[in-house]
């Protein structure tokens, strides 16, 4: 993963309305194994996050200036340090306006993955821990806690430059601590949501279920194709890459690689050629689960309508082909 440029600044800010104090670095970070490892770990943590949103830049304006500064950098009108400095000063201002915001180290990294260039911007925090030193003493230790990555964005620079109609070249973590906490960071990026990841994923899964039903596939074949879809989409999610419908179609049916893709287009599901899959929605598709009042039920989604029948009006499930161990337990209880 070649790293073109990388720099870190610090904004000291507590969520109590106090001023945000900027400690800006004057030069880029030199290339090192530590930087490589940091970016690799950051990518892994970011890709694993649930609840990301996808979108595109607002039109450049005084309220959303980042895209203009980024364009100046890419056009070599600003160097990377100058770009990051003016950007972090803007973030400092937005933090001061958001009383709930907390400061931290702001990472800017321009890097390449495969043939694609990205800009990552992340707010990083430390965790306190302990370490054992060379003298075998236990000492306090601070480290960047990438597991607590709550505010970060990734801009696909190649997509932004080459596809003017794209509405999903920016992804960002929406945050779990309330809408207002993360809104200032989204406004800093200047991003408007263009793609509903969970909604697009649900539509894709609905299209797949309709396809399986229309093909009247045997249970084993349906299970294999379901597994193929989930594994491919999950892998793409881990890589931070979108699901490509044509590629997915060729994996689902190697003998008829366009069958599923043509089904989607002919039925007009309104799906884009590439969609950002949502991990949580995929997991729900893999299995149905529920627990209440001492009862726990879990079964693979493809069994619904076959070995498991749901009567919505009566609110009941009929399960066929019970596991032998469960049948034995029930018989012993009856005896």
Swiss-Prot record:
Cellular component GO terms, alphabetical: bacterial nucleoid; cytoplasm
Annotated compartments: Cytoplasm, Nucleoid
Pfam families with a match to the protein in the record: NA37
Record keyword Cytoplasm present: yes
GO molecular function: double-stranded DNA binding; single-stranded RNA binding
Keyword annotations: Cytoplasm
InterPro entries, alphabetized: Nucleoid_associated_NdpA
Principal subcellular localization: cytoplasm
Keyword Lipid metabolism attached: no
UniProt family annotation: Belongs to the YejK family.
Protein name (database record): Nucleoid-associated protein PputGB1_0980
Source organism per UniProt: Pseudomonas putida (strain GB-1)
